[in-house]
Amino acid sequence: MRVALGIEYDGRQYFGWQRQAEVDSVQAQLERALSKVANEPIRVHCAGRTDAGVHATGQVVHFETNAIRKDSAWTLGVNVNLPDDIAVRWVKIVDDEFHARFSATARRYRYMIYNYDFRPGILRSGVSHYRGNIDADIMHQAAQQFVGEHDFTSFRALHCQSKTPFRSVHEVNVTRQGMYICVDIKANAFLHHMVRNIVGTLLEIGLGNQRPEWIPQLLDLKDRSQAAPTAKPNGLYMVDVTYPERYELPKLALGPLFMLD
């Protein structure tokens, strides 16, 4: 039997999604909890691996099991065995052809910026703090140059393992709500550090250190060293994964919870 789960987590205590020897990860905690409920070893496959300190409200995973359980066992039962900063949001029995990663047609991330002179006390692990007068409108205008299929070599991590640097960005929106700025980006898939590198570049433009035409120049250069520093991890959320409608997966509010969808 193949089971799909919707997962959310606060990534600050973990060395990313992927299971690793000698360090804690979201995957390891989830597999441990699922194995207890199933009474057999469980290995999960995710829609997209997140880095250390990165959060998710819309991660999707699937796993194979011989255990026959009620849906409540895969939600409430698993949650009882998880740390407080990881939670199952929904469960769905899926066809054997479904794959959390390969069946996905798009992923969506939100990057939350707290733009104020002084650091935040509340939500400090869920936003990235940047001082200065950040122009969200010019960031939004500049961000439209990322839409479409491009070679994102200038916006991938130096050790990114993807075989191709090409990705198709479906939409990017930058909005401000008081002291909070949200960079919302959807694409068919993302390269390692791609969202944070895009945000770092948009911040340089929003702060007035660069002009919007810098973006097409960076895309043409295909040189990571020429772009802005990578934005901090703690403001980044994986908020949604898109699948064909035939799978009938649940759709919940994107989050993070303090955002209005």
From Swiss-Prot:
Catalytic activities:
uridine(38/39/40) in tRNA = pseudouridine(38/39/40) in tRNA
Q: Which residues form the active site?
A: D51 (nucleophile)
Q: Where does substrate bind?
A: Y109
A Gene Ontology annotation in the biological process aspect, one of them, is: tRNA pseudouridine synthesis
Q: Which Pfam families match?
A: PseudoU_synth_1
UniProt entry keywords in alphabetical sequence: Isomerase, tRNA processing
Which InterPro entries does the entry link to?
A: PsdUridine_synth_cat_dom_sf (IPR020103), PsdUridine_synth_TruA (IPR001406), PsdUridine_synth_TruA_a/b_dom (IPR020097), PsdUridine_synth_TruA_C (IPR020095), TruA/RsuA/RluB/E/F_N (IPR020094)
Kindly report, in one word, the top-level EC class recorded for this enzyme.
isomerase
Molecular function in Gene Ontology: RNA binding; tRNA pseudouridine(38-40) synthase activity
What EC number(s) does the entry state?
A: 5.4.99.12
Query: Which domain of life does this protein belong to?
Result: Bacteria
Name the CDD domains for this protein: PseudoU_synth_EcTruA
Q: Which cysteines are joined by disulfide bonds?
A: none
Q: Does the keyword Isomerase apply?
A: yes
Sequence similarity: Belongs to the tRNA pseudouridine synthase TruA family.
Task: Report the function annotation for this chain.
Answer: Formation of pseudouridine at positions 38, 39 and 40 in the anticodon stem and loop of transfer RNAs.
HAMAP family associated with the record:
TruA
| Subunit structure, interactors included | Homodimer.
Protein name stated in the entry: tRNA pseudouridine synthase A
